[in-house]
Design a protein with these regions (language model features):
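Low-complexity, highly charged intrinsically disordered N-terminal segments
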Residues: 1-37, 186-199, 236-239
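N-terminal pre-Walker A segment at the start of P-loop NTPase domains
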Residues: 31-59, 102-105
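Short, well-ordered amphipathic alpha-helices
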Residues: 48-55, 83-89, 150, 240
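Structured alpha-helical segments in the cores of large, soluble enzyme domains
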Residues: 49-57, 108-116, 238-240
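Short coil/loop residues immediately preceding or within conserved phosphate-binding loops
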Residues: 63
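P-loop NTPase motor core
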Residues: 66-71, 80-203
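Conserved lysine of the Walker
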Residues: 76
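Conserved helicase/translocase P-loop NTPase motor core
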Residues: 206-240
Protein backbone atom coordinates (compact mmCIF):
# COMPACT_ATOMS: atom_id res chain seq x y z
CA UNK A 1 0.00 0.00 0.00
CA UNK A 2 1.28 3.44 -0.93
CA UNK A 3 1.27 6.17 1.70
CA UNK A 4 -0.91 8.44 -0.46
CA UNK A 5 -3.65 5.79 -0.54
CA UNK A 6 -3.91 5.86 3.26
CA UNK A 7 -5.49 9.31 3.23
CA UNK A 8 -9.20 9.87 2.86
CA UNK A 9 -8.76 12.84 0.53
CA UNK A 10 -6.52 13.30 -2.48
CA UNK A 11 -3.21 14.65 -1.18
CA UNK A 12 -2.52 16.25 -4.56
CA UNK A 13 -5.61 18.47 -4.38
CA UNK A 14 -5.19 22.23 -4.36
CA UNK A 15 -5.09 23.59 -0.81
CA UNK A 16 -5.23 27.30 -0.05
CA UNK A 17 -2.29 28.14 2.15
CA UNK A 18 -3.91 31.36 3.33
CA UNK A 19 -7.62 31.76 4.03
CA UNK A 20 -8.96 34.91 2.40
CA UNK A 21 -12.29 36.65 2.83
CA UNK A 22 -12.45 37.25 -0.91
CA UNK A 23 -12.34 33.52 -1.67
CA UNK A 24 -16.08 32.90 -1.71
CA UNK A 25 -16.61 30.68 -4.74
CA UNK A 26 -18.59 27.50 -4.10
CA UNK A 27 -15.61 25.16 -4.51
CA UNK A 28 -13.44 27.07 -2.04
CA UNK A 29 -16.27 27.37 0.48
CA UNK A 30 -17.07 23.67 0.24
CA UNK A 31 -13.45 22.74 0.81
CA UNK A 32 -13.08 25.12 3.75
CA UNK A 33 -16.25 23.89 5.45
CA UNK A 34 -15.74 20.17 4.87
CA UNK A 35 -12.05 20.14 5.79
CA UNK A 36 -12.17 22.44 8.82
CA UNK A 37 -10.86 20.64 11.89
CA UNK A 38 -12.09 21.62 15.34
CA UNK A 39 -9.18 21.04 17.70
CA UNK A 40 -9.48 21.04 21.49
CA UNK A 41 -8.44 24.69 21.57
CA UNK A 42 -10.93 25.65 18.86
CA UNK A 43 -13.65 23.69 20.64
CA UNK A 44 -13.11 25.91 23.65
CA UNK A 45 -13.31 29.07 21.53
CA UNK A 46 -16.46 27.90 19.74
CA UNK A 47 -18.03 27.07 23.10
CA UNK A 48 -17.15 30.50 24.53
CA UNK A 49 -18.64 32.29 21.54
CA UNK A 50 -21.86 30.30 21.17
CA UNK A 51 -22.53 30.00 24.91
CA UNK A 52 -22.59 33.80 25.07
CA UNK A 53 -24.39 34.18 21.74
CA UNK A 54 -27.24 31.88 22.78
CA UNK A 55 -27.77 33.88 25.98
CA UNK A 56 -28.55 36.96 23.89
CA UNK A 57 -31.29 35.06 22.06
CA UNK A 58 -33.31 34.61 25.25
CA UNK A 59 -32.13 37.81 26.92
CA UNK A 60 -31.29 40.51 24.33
CA UNK A 61 -28.30 42.66 25.22
CA UNK A 62 -26.26 45.48 23.74
CA UNK A 63 -23.03 43.76 24.79
CA UNK A 64 -22.44 42.28 21.37
CA UNK A 65 -18.77 42.94 20.62
CA UNK A 66 -16.36 40.05 20.11
CA UNK A 67 -12.59 40.37 19.99
CA UNK A 68 -10.57 37.65 18.26
CA UNK A 69 -6.84 37.95 18.85
CA UNK A 70 -3.81 35.80 18.14
CA UNK A 71 -0.42 35.68 16.51
CA UNK A 72 -0.01 36.01 12.75
CA UNK A 73 -0.97 32.73 11.10
CA UNK A 74 -2.74 31.38 14.19
CA UNK A 75 -6.04 30.91 12.34
CA UNK A 76 -7.99 34.01 13.37
CA UNK A 77 -9.36 34.70 9.89
CA UNK A 78 -10.24 31.05 9.37
CA UNK A 79 -12.08 30.90 12.69
CA UNK A 80 -13.93 34.14 11.95
CA UNK A 81 -14.89 32.89 8.51
CA UNK A 82 -16.35 29.70 10.00
CA UNK A 83 -18.36 31.72 12.53
CA UNK A 84 -19.70 33.82 9.67
CA UNK A 85 -20.74 30.75 7.68
CA UNK A 86 -22.36 29.11 10.68
CA UNK A 87 -24.33 32.16 11.80
CA UNK A 88 -25.68 32.85 8.31
CA UNK A 89 -25.96 29.08 7.72
CA UNK A 90 -25.46 29.76 4.05
CA UNK A 91 -26.01 27.00 1.53
CA UNK A 92 -22.88 25.68 -0.13
CA UNK A 93 -23.11 23.06 -2.86
CA UNK A 94 -26.65 22.11 -1.84
CA UNK A 95 -25.78 21.75 1.84
CA UNK A 96 -26.14 24.24 4.69
CA UNK A 97 -23.03 25.31 6.59
CA UNK A 98 -24.25 23.81 9.87
CA UNK A 99 -24.65 20.41 8.20
CA UNK A 100 -20.95 20.42 7.35
CA UNK A 101 -20.28 20.68 11.09
CA UNK A 102 -22.67 17.89 12.11
CA UNK A 103 -19.84 15.48 12.90
CA UNK A 104 -17.34 18.11 14.06
CA UNK A 105 -18.99 18.92 17.41
CA UNK A 106 -18.53 15.83 19.57
CA UNK A 107 -20.28 17.41 22.56
CA UNK A 108 -24.10 17.00 22.26
CA UNK A 109 -24.71 20.09 24.41
CA UNK A 110 -22.48 22.24 22.24
CA UNK A 111 -24.09 20.83 19.10
CA UNK A 112 -27.54 21.74 20.42
CA UNK A 113 -26.36 25.24 21.38
CA UNK A 114 -24.94 25.92 17.92
CA UNK A 115 -28.04 24.48 16.31
CA UNK A 116 -30.24 26.86 18.30
CA UNK A 117 -28.08 29.80 17.24
CA UNK A 118 -28.12 29.02 13.53
CA UNK A 119 -31.90 28.72 13.53
CA UNK A 120 -32.10 32.48 14.06
CA UNK A 121 -32.25 34.16 10.61
CA UNK A 122 -28.92 35.95 10.32
CA UNK A 123 -27.04 37.81 7.62
CA UNK A 124 -23.29 38.09 7.93
CA UNK A 125 -21.11 40.69 6.24
CA UNK A 126 -17.54 39.47 5.94
CA UNK A 127 -14.88 41.89 4.72
CA UNK A 128 -11.24 42.89 5.02
CA UNK A 129 -11.08 46.36 6.51
CA UNK A 130 -7.64 47.07 4.98
CA UNK A 131 -8.97 46.43 1.48
CA UNK A 132 -12.30 48.19 1.91
CA UNK A 133 -10.91 51.15 3.87
CA UNK A 134 -10.36 54.60 2.35
CA UNK A 135 -6.95 56.04 1.55
CA UNK A 136 -7.67 58.95 3.86
CA UNK A 137 -7.25 57.48 7.35
CA UNK A 138 -9.03 60.16 9.36
CA UNK A 139 -10.95 59.59 12.58
CA UNK A 140 -14.07 58.52 10.67
CA UNK A 141 -12.25 55.99 8.45
CA UNK A 142 -13.45 52.90 10.31
CA UNK A 143 -17.03 54.17 10.50
CA UNK A 144 -16.98 54.90 6.77
CA UNK A 145 -15.82 51.35 6.03
CA UNK A 146 -18.63 49.87 8.10
CA UNK A 147 -21.18 52.17 6.46
CA UNK A 148 -19.81 51.35 3.01
CA UNK A 149 -19.97 47.55 3.31
CA UNK A 150 -23.33 47.67 5.09
CA UNK A 151 -24.99 49.78 2.40
CA UNK A 152 -23.41 47.67 -0.33
CA UNK A 153 -24.85 44.60 1.38
CA UNK A 154 -28.29 46.25 1.37
CA UNK A 155 -28.07 46.88 -2.37
CA UNK A 156 -27.22 50.58 -2.13
CA UNK A 157 -24.08 52.23 -3.51
CA UNK A 158 -21.84 52.24 -0.45
CA UNK A 159 -18.83 53.44 -2.43
CA UNK A 160 -20.39 56.92 -2.33
CA UNK A 161 -22.23 57.54 0.93
CA UNK A 162 -24.10 60.53 -0.53
CA UNK A 163 -25.56 58.30 -3.22
CA UNK A 164 -26.29 55.57 -0.66
CA UNK A 165 -28.08 58.11 1.54
CA UNK A 166 -30.16 59.23 -1.45
CA UNK A 167 -31.02 55.64 -2.38
CA UNK A 168 -31.98 54.87 1.21
CA UNK A 169 -34.32 57.87 1.26
CA UNK A 170 -35.95 56.83 -2.02
CA UNK A 171 -36.30 53.25 -0.79
CA UNK A 172 -38.02 54.39 2.41
CA UNK A 173 -40.62 56.09 0.22
CA UNK A 174 -41.13 52.81 -1.62
CA UNK A 175 -40.11 54.45 -4.89
CA UNK A 176 -36.90 52.62 -5.81
CA UNK A 177 -38.22 50.94 -8.95
CA UNK A 178 -40.11 54.06 -10.03
CA UNK A 179 -36.99 56.20 -9.58
CA UNK A 180 -34.83 53.78 -11.56
CA UNK A 181 -37.36 53.73 -14.38
CA UNK A 182 -37.60 57.54 -14.40
CA UNK A 183 -33.81 57.90 -14.40
CA UNK A 184 -33.42 55.48 -17.30
CA UNK A 185 -36.05 57.40 -19.26
CA UNK A 186 -34.10 60.66 -19.04
CA UNK A 187 -30.57 59.26 -19.00
CA UNK A 188 -30.83 56.20 -21.21
CA UNK A 189 -28.77 54.02 -18.88
CA UNK A 190 -29.71 51.85 -15.92
CA UNK A 191 -29.34 53.58 -12.56
CA UNK A 192 -27.14 50.80 -11.13
CA UNK A 193 -24.73 51.29 -14.03
CA UNK A 194 -24.66 55.07 -13.81
CA UNK A 195 -24.77 55.71 -10.06
CA UNK A 196 -20.99 55.61 -9.69
CA UNK A 197 -21.02 58.77 -11.82
CA UNK A 198 -24.17 60.26 -10.28
CA UNK A 199 -22.48 63.62 -9.68
CA UNK A 200 -22.04 64.03 -13.45
CA UNK A 201 -25.70 63.24 -14.08
CA UNK A 202 -27.09 65.65 -11.50
CA UNK A 203 -29.70 67.09 -13.87
CA UNK A 204 -30.99 63.59 -14.70
CA UNK A 205 -31.14 62.65 -11.01
CA UNK A 206 -32.98 65.87 -10.19
CA UNK A 207 -35.49 65.34 -12.98
CA UNK A 208 -36.14 61.76 -11.82
CA UNK A 209 -36.60 62.91 -8.21
CA UNK A 210 -39.04 65.62 -9.28
CA UNK A 211 -40.99 63.16 -11.39
CA UNK A 212 -41.18 60.35 -8.84
CA UNK A 213 -41.23 62.14 -5.49
CA UNK A 214 -42.79 65.43 -6.53
CA UNK A 215 -39.86 67.41 -5.13
CA UNK A 216 -39.04 70.95 -6.13
CA UNK A 217 -35.88 71.45 -8.18
CA UNK A 218 -34.18 73.18 -5.25
CA UNK A 219 -34.99 70.35 -2.84
CA UNK A 220 -33.96 67.73 -5.38
CA UNK A 221 -30.57 69.37 -5.90
CA UNK A 222 -29.86 69.48 -2.18
CA UNK A 223 -28.88 65.78 -2.13
CA UNK A 224 -25.58 66.59 -3.87
CA UNK A 225 -24.71 69.41 -1.49
CA UNK A 226 -25.80 67.69 1.72
CA UNK A 227 -23.18 66.62 4.23
CA UNK A 228 -22.73 62.94 5.02
CA UNK A 229 -22.17 62.17 8.68
CA UNK A 230 -20.80 58.61 9.04
CA UNK A 231 -21.84 58.59 12.70
CA UNK A 232 -25.44 59.20 11.66
CA UNK A 233 -25.27 56.65 8.84
CA UNK A 234 -23.99 53.98 11.23
CA UNK A 235 -26.71 54.92 13.72
CA UNK A 236 -29.28 54.49 10.94
CA UNK A 237 -28.31 50.84 10.49
CA UNK A 238 -30.45 50.06 13.51
CA UNK A 239 -33.56 50.92 11.49
CA UNK A 240 -32.98 48.16 8.95
Amino acid sequence: MKIQSMFQKDINRDINGVIKVSQDDQQSLKQELSEYIITKELRRHFATFFDNYVKAIDNPTDKIGVWISGFFGSGKSHFLKMLSYLLSNKEVDGKHAFDYFADKFDDPMMYATVQKCVRIPTESILFNIDIEGPINKDKTAVLRVFAKVFYNHCGFYGEDLKVAKLERFIDKQGKTEAFRAAFKEVNGDEWVNARDSAAFFEDDVVEALQSVLGMSETAARNWKNSEVDPYFLCFQTGSF
